[in-house]
Amino acid sequence: METTNLLLPSTRRTRMGMINRTFIEDAVIVSEKEQKKEHPNFIESNTSGITLEELETNCIVPSFGDNQLTISHQTFIHRIEEAASMFFAGETFGNTEIRVSHKILGRHPSALTKRKEELKPEDETIYYQRMAFCFHIRTICREMNGEEVHLCIGGVRSLNEENLYGKKSPEKFKIFIGWRVRVCSNLMLTCDGLTGRLEVMGDMDIYIAALKLFREFNLEQNLRLLENLGRTMISQEQFCQIIGRLRLYQVLPASQMKELPKVILGDSNINAATKGYIDNPNFGLRGRAKISCWDLMQLLNEAAKQSYIDKFLERNQNATDFAVGIQKALKGEDTENYGWFLR
């Protein structure tokens, strides 16, 4: 999706020298030249890849109506990287993967009278309205239900949530930490690994919020919760019942929907999960009579990768919560009415 706006030139915002970096020397960042691409993209729908260098050199930083700069995408990324490098000092980090969407085009004032076909690259300005990024910690890895998983950190920023025509106001970001499956790049986010919508006035607030999130995230407890999903099986009949109920859920009256767990997966996500049940080489049937709740979570998380950037994290967490809820219902421990999806 592309939108064309008339933008005045804006100074690019670079990394601020506010943070003493002496305490992060022990962290190791693996450069792109040293590491080849190892896995699929962590999100697919309507996005394209971009490097940090391209963000810094090719994209302007939009400003508010009072001409105060927004926090740039690259500054957001740098602050999370710095917080991770400090908190996980001594660990080795993989490349930072960046996905963007909704390109916003503009013109420099000197090119206002030019026709579109006359424009040269230097006449145009560009920035991306939505951006997501993540990087994994190569030295914090485990085996979970037969799959290699790494601890992964990242964030999402959507400028469409900001009122750029008004005065500078708190800017909105999302930060996450959680486990990611090596073979397919599926994130497995839980509520304690996601900040929700974080509103900040400056980039140091991002740094502080990231450290708080990392401190409160229990790696091993989270790992055990997810690994336990592999111990509960789902028959083909039960899977079909779940899919049918997920479709029915979307057209229920609001009064009835309030009595059920919240599900924010859409039709396209459910269709993708159904297709994956048949042909996903890692988590589908593969000639088996049953799949596990772990497989169900992966199918739903894989399907959530087809969401737009600004909806992706919430849908991923929702998919994880749903699989955990289904497991509890199957074990007779249901306290949130997930059993409705099995009836």
Mark where each language-model region is.
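Feature for intrinsically disordered/low-complexity regulatory segments and propeptides
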Residues: 2-81, 85-92, 96-100, 104
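Intrinsically disordered, low-complexity regions enriched in serine/threonine
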Residues: 1-40, 116-343
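A short acidic/basic microdomain associated with nuclease active sites
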Residues: 86-132
